[in-house]
Amino acid sequence: MKKVLNKYSRRLTEDKSQGASQAMLYGTEMNDADMHKPQIGIGSVWYEGNTCNMHLNQLAQFVKDSVEKENLKGMRFNTIGVSDGISMGTDGMSYSLQSRDLIADSIETVMSAHWYDGLVSIPGCDKNMPGCMMALGRLNRPGFVIYGGTIQAGVMRGKPIDIVTAFQSYGACLSGQITEQERQETIKKACPGAGACGGMYTANTMACAIEALGMSLPFSSSTSATSVEKVQECDKAGETIKNLLELDIKPRDIMTRKAFENAMVLITVMGGSTNAVLHLLAMASSVDVDLSIDDFQEIANKTPVLADFKPSGKYVKANLHAIGGTPAVMKMLLKAGMLHGDCLTVTGKTLAENLENVADLPEDNTIIHKLDNPIKKTGHLQILKGNVAPEGSVAKITGKEGEIFEGVANVFDSEEEMVAAVETGKVKKGDVIVIRYEGPKGGPGMPEMLKPTSLIMGAGLGQDVALITDGRFSGGSHGFIVGHITPEAYEGGMIALLENGDKITIDAINNVINVDLSDQEIAQRKSKWRASKQKASRGTLKKYIKTVSSA
């Protein structure tokens, strides 16, 4: 008996009582044969205003062509996106994290309302990645991700530069390290075309995580946006989704607990973004896999950092593709017993089977260190707790900035206040910069603090100050930084009670973050604290404040 592959779409296309549905589909130039084909949603996060996303509509057309060669019906649709790089440092960043959930909601909505049988999702930027994955997990229909791909490095006066070079150029100009002319040249040459920000920033981090999970094709996370290989990946979409339909392999068959452990190992080895903690937790929730921040610490305790990628290192993701790409790194880890090779993937094969014929990394490569010569012996993503963060926080400590920092609090109630302080020389060596009321509810939307960290690095203070916040950090942030402090200031967390001059210790060896205050002093400050007014009184951010939970 022939297997039914259009088990969802036939609800509309083969039911005589759905004549109006069929009339509208005929109106889209579908014919009689098309009515019996499985319908594949091709969900792109295309829009023109961002290098990460501007080419995705073209990739979606390549995918549609591939799907229809397999006697399937491709149905392209779009969802929204927010460019963190463009909105960074402005109130627009409040919309970034909530865009992840809007993307997931909108893909789920279109797929469910139109009864599509499978999904090929094409994200390009930071929050696109988990948003698409959350939708796939909720729907649990055959589907996978095609990453839009990484950007090529920019070149200025013979040296490679990227988006973080552009972010840091303002601080460098303020401190006299570069001229205004050099700053202008930097920002014009940092982004040479289509593709996601090139270092191990959030989009590339999540692309690695998705490939390690088995939810994208091998090499998807390391091929460049404008490469022939990316087009070839799109050309494989039809046979891949048809195979998933025929084998009835669904996201929840792939996104298992062991697969998430693979993802956590890979992003640790790669030196990935702190945002991976938030996003992997949300992705796991979408498929009912029990994952907590403590699981990240367990992985960090036994997993080294091996990759020398920007922002703290030398290389961009395009450099990795030239020496074998993400699969070559995973093959090394599999050989070392650090990955679960028996996990199923969207190829219909196991992870180990996918990696069987992948070439080893070149012995003399300088991008991925050997296991016996790590950049850091344990993971860079450290979960810190203490009286500053009783419910936890996420630190990004590569080891290059040290592992313990003691200093005095320099407190700011917004990102803007801190930026103004740097501009006027009010941030000094030995400061623990505190930026608060930037959490999920207080921000709102938990904006990323890339502008402050870039100013710090650009001003040459990267080794001399620490920054803690109830907001987030971009994958482009580096230095001695601790984010996701919970409870957040808006809800009366300890970070709301800190004052200028308080002595703060950040210890990434023992995983603690404490302020030197007695319980009596803390209780006294707490009694005087009053909740601040919501920053959003209408619209989507008001809804977000009402529904979002603690980081």
UniProtKB/Swiss-Prot annotation:
<feature type="active site" description="Proton acceptor">
    <location>
        <position position="474"/>
    </location>
</feature>
<comment type="similarity">
    <text>Belongs to the IlvD/Edd family.</text>
</comment>
<keyword id="KW-0479">Metal-binding</keyword>
<feature type="binding site">
    <location>
        <position position="197"/>
    </location>
    <ligand>
        <name>[2Fe-2S] cluster</name>
    </ligand>
</feature>
<keyword id="KW-0408">Iron</keyword>
<dbReference type="Pfam" id="PF24877">
    <property type="entry name" value="ILV_EDD_C"/>
</dbReference>
<comment type="subunit">
    <text>Homodimer.</text>
</comment>
<keyword id="KW-0460">Magnesium</keyword>
<feature type="binding site">
    <location>
        <position position="52"/>
    </location>
    <ligand>
        <name>[2Fe-2S] cluster</name>
    </ligand>
</feature>
<feature type="binding site" description="via carbamate group">
    <location>
        <position position="127"/>
    </location>
    <ligand>
        <name>Mg(2+)</name>
    </ligand>
</feature>
<dbReference type="InterPro" id="IPR020558">
    <property type="entry name" value="DiOHA_6PGluconate_deHydtase_CS"/>
</dbReference>
<dbReference type="InterPro" id="IPR056740">
    <property type="entry name" value="ILV_EDD_C"/>
</dbReference>
<dbReference type="InterPro" id="IPR042096">
    <property type="entry name" value="Dihydro-acid_dehy_C"/>
</dbReference>
<dbReference type="InterPro" id="IPR050165">
    <property type="entry name" value="DHAD_IlvD/Edd"/>
</dbReference>
<dbReference type="GO" id="GO:0004160">
    <property type="term" value="F:dihydroxy-acid dehydratase activity"/>
</dbReference>
<dbReference type="InterPro" id="IPR037237">
    <property type="entry name" value="IlvD/EDD_N"/>
</dbReference>
<dbReference type="GO" id="GO:0009099">
    <property type="term" value="P:L-valine biosynthetic process"/>
</dbReference>
<protein>
    <recommendedName>
        <fullName>Dihydroxy-acid dehydratase</fullName>
        <ecNumber>4.2.1.9</ecNumber>
    </recommendedName>
</protein>
<feature type="binding site">
    <location>
        <position position="125"/>
    </location>
    <ligand>
        <name>[2Fe-2S] cluster</name>
    </ligand>
</feature>
<feature type="binding site">
    <location>
        <position position="448"/>
    </location>
    <ligand>
        <name>Mg(2+)</name>
    </ligand>
</feature>
<keyword id="KW-0001">2Fe-2S</keyword>
<feature type="binding site">
    <location>
        <position position="84"/>
    </location>
    <ligand>
        <name>Mg(2+)</name>
    </ligand>
</feature>
<feature type="modified residue" description="N6-carboxylysine">
    <location>
        <position position="127"/>
    </location>
</feature>
<keyword id="KW-0100">Branched-chain amino acid biosynthesis</keyword>
<feature type="binding site">
    <location>
        <position position="126"/>
    </location>
    <ligand>
        <name>Mg(2+)</name>
    </ligand>
</feature>
<keyword id="KW-0411">Iron-sulfur</keyword>
<comment type="pathway">
    <text>Amino-acid biosynthesis; L-valine biosynthesis; L-valine from pyruvate: step 3/4.</text>
</comment>
<dbReference type="InterPro" id="IPR000581">
    <property type="entry name" value="ILV_EDD_N"/>
</dbReference>
<dbReference type="Pfam" id="PF00920">
    <property type="entry name" value="ILVD_EDD_N"/>
</dbReference>
<dbReference type="InterPro" id="IPR004404">
    <property type="entry name" value="DihydroxyA_deHydtase"/>
</dbReference>
<dbReference type="GO" id="GO:0000287">
    <property type="term" value="F:magnesium ion binding"/>
</dbReference>
<keyword id="KW-0456">Lyase</keyword>
<comment type="function">
    <text>Functions in the biosynthesis of branched-chain amino acids. Catalyzes the dehydration of (2R,3R)-2,3-dihydroxy-3-methylpentanoate (2,3-dihydroxy-3-methylvalerate) into 2-oxo-3-methylpentanoate (2-oxo-3-methylvalerate) and of (2R)-2,3-dihydroxy-3-methylbutanoate (2,3-dihydroxyisovalerate) into 2-oxo-3-methylbutanoate (2-oxoisovalerate), the penultimate precursor to L-isoleucine and L-valine, respectively.</text>
</comment>
<comment type="pathway">
    <text>Amino-acid biosynthesis; L-isoleucine biosynthesis; L-isoleucine from 2-oxobutanoate: step 3/4.</text>
</comment>
<dbReference type="GO" id="GO:0009097">
    <property type="term" value="P:isoleucine biosynthetic process"/>
</dbReference>
<keyword id="KW-0028">Amino-acid biosynthesis</keyword>
<dbReference type="GO" id="GO:0051537">
    <property type="term" value="F:2 iron, 2 sulfur cluster binding"/>
</dbReference>
